Amino acid sequence: MENTKKTLTINGHEVEIGSEKNLLEMIRKIGIELPTFCYHSELSAYGACRLCLVEVEGRGIMASCSTAPEAGMKIRTDSKQLREMRKINIELLLANHKRECPSCIRSYSCTLQNLARRLGVEEIRYKQITEFEPIDESSPSLTRDPNKCVLCGDCVRMCKEVQGIGAIDFTHRGSHSKVAPAFEADLASVECINCGQCVQVCPTGALTPK
């Protein structure tokens, strides 16, 4: 009988392709934990944080969370180039992040803080290019601090895809991109149902419970 097993190679090890939706799931299956902000298996892949980058032979560097596994792929998850790219991406996020870690409610449970430590970020080589904005305290259930948002999109997808509400979304483009309610209103003015699901997936102190 012909062998129909499909495999790919991760760091020199042959791995069988099963029901995994993307390379990140394949990599996690063999016990390798790549850094990531914006990936949740129950939400659509977004690929914004650029931390789960891998090298795919013949294709270059790709986001593992948004790349489907294919038979014959040869993948490398760790190299000097990948480590430097991940470090730069964290530094860029920190450059526009309100760094008040000691007093932040998410201190020591903040994904950004933990990844900065893990990736060895000791200094930030980039300048802040965005201006800090007022904190939104209008909601009875949560506080929204746009100055701690890393644009991972987790809250946007959770609100839209799981809750079916869409109270918040991306606004503007490029370096002016932000996550906010429609027309940049406060949360109390839009169809937020105060479910708290956005708080659960937020990796930083941008959304916190009251």
PLM regions with names:
Residues 15-71, 81:
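N-terminal cofactor/phosphate-binding cores enriched in small/glycine residues
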Residues 22, 154, 197:
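Residue-level recognition of oxygen-bearing side chains
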Residues 50, 54-191, 200-210:
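Fe-S ferredoxin-like electron-transfer domains
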